[in-house]
Amino acid sequence: FILDALRRKTVDHADHAASLPALGDLSVANLFGGGDYITGIEIFAVLGGDSIEKGALAGMSALKELTVPFVGATKNDTGEEGLFGYIFGSDSYSGSFEIKSGLSAEDYISPELCFTFYVPQGLKKVTVLDGDVFDGAFMNMRTLTEVVFADDADTTYIGEAAFMGATALEGFTVPAGVSIVGDYAFCFSGVRTVDMSAADEITVLPEYIFGENTRLATISLPENLVTIEGYAFYMASALKNIVIPDSVTTIGEYAFYACTSLESVSLPANLKTLGASAFSRCLSLEGMEIDQSNKDFVTYDGILYSSDYELAYVVPAGIVGPVRMPEAVTIIPGGFFSECKNLKGVIFHDKITAIGDSAFAYCTGLETLTIGKNVTNIMENAFIYAGNKDTVINFETGSKYAYVKKDAFYRLTAKEINLPASAVTFDGEAFRMCEAEVKFHEDTTLTTVVADMFKDYLGTSIELPASVTTIGARAFMDALNLETIEFDATKITSVGFDAFRNTKWYNSQPDGIVVLSGLAYEIKGARNTLTSVTLPADTVVLAGSLFNGCSNLTTLVLNEGLLAISGSAFANCVNLIELVIPKTVTSIGAQAFNNMSATIVFATDGSLTHLGDQAFYGYKGKTLNIPA
């Protein structure tokens, strides 16, 4: 027997007494004079119902294959005695490596709750002759590539986390008699192929059974399966296709979430319940299919809807399009196309009235998107991180889109947005962090660039329509890339404070009065050092608060051709002696002369037609002569 074992380097206990009863302190390695040459052991039975003691196989450093009558100490042991590593013991030896095996997924995450065993580094294959596989049995067995069961094995149960962390597993066939598989059974394992087809008593795939298994490529499911629970294949990123049996009625939330290689799915006729995000972030999935006899779901252009189209259950992340929207859909819901990075476009019909928040988030493949004419509401973040340097956003002729809300185009990375003529009302920060060039329609009647409208805008240039008369406070503030700003200064009657502050254009200007297209916008540098100023001859508008607080200014010469003086333009110029208002000035804003005592001289043939509210509020001069 020993000579035969030495010759074959395997120990076969099939025909020898007391395969592995209690051996006292004598391990198998000691029995055969050391375990550094035995590569295979087959244990077919333990006589008299005795157990395999803890550490019975300690020291078997050359072991590559092992056949056991059951997993653990006895056929029915659970707890530590039901773990595969138990028979190798908790003492290290040459050629062993440490594993941490627990009884649940929580133990896997918290190794301090696990049991420590030392198993041979080269152990690759284990054959189980009989019995169930209890919770955590093969947890963290990182060298095993194969675990097989005898054809006549009475195996009905594979426990929770049974193969969790067994990262080298190649293939696994579930024994025909198995009816229950526990949660997390193959979570974090490396099993590539799984065959469950013979286990026709399995009706439930539990939570996380294959969760975060990044090597699982193919699987055959049992034909009587009814439920695929939530997170069952969560982030199984190598899974390419799966055939879901006709018997399945329920697929839980996040069941196939982030199965990034999944290319095709055909849903069965009996499916009644589909959980939230069941197929979200399946980046290779271009379209969904469902049996046409299914009464609860329907597909339209590759998207899975409820049969009445009131809910969209799956928008495949790999969808290309352009995608047509069903007539029954009147709103593109929040997050609808989120992370559809291959989406080229969407075809709107006339019944669509709104685009929800994050509806096109991260749709980086958009080419040309023409928004339907009846869309009146675009929610915040609708296009966050959408588009690319070639993307164009258009609005259909006759568009009714009038009100642009805050962050409607936040983080849009498109080439350009061509706004419709109807878009005349804007919130502040409507284009915050937007990289697209914003183009106004030639027929727009927009009059006001509201406060903060382009604050933090990331575009490089902008041309305001000729209809604009007012630029609000901080309108372009912190638009760090903005180097070209075009508008008709002759039409501007009011510019708010810090309107262009910290733009690329502004930051390139020298100290002194900053003039843009005839707009004297701001004094850059120290204001209180100015004593005498003569405006450039082409100045047509003074921005709000332009000279506010220039306390040492004594002489100010305004140019002929100046048209408008914005609010608080001369406020607090306490030492200014005289101010001559050119006859070309037609408009003076609110509190323009607050807290100043200079003599103000108006031309008798002047063109003044507008005085703002409280234009002379706080004026301390003695005489005013305002032309009729």
Where are these regions (language model features)?
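Structural signature of tandem-repeat unit edges
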Residues: 6-25, 29-51, 61-77, 96-132, ...
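Short, flexible/disordered intra-domain loops and linkers
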Residues: 74-87
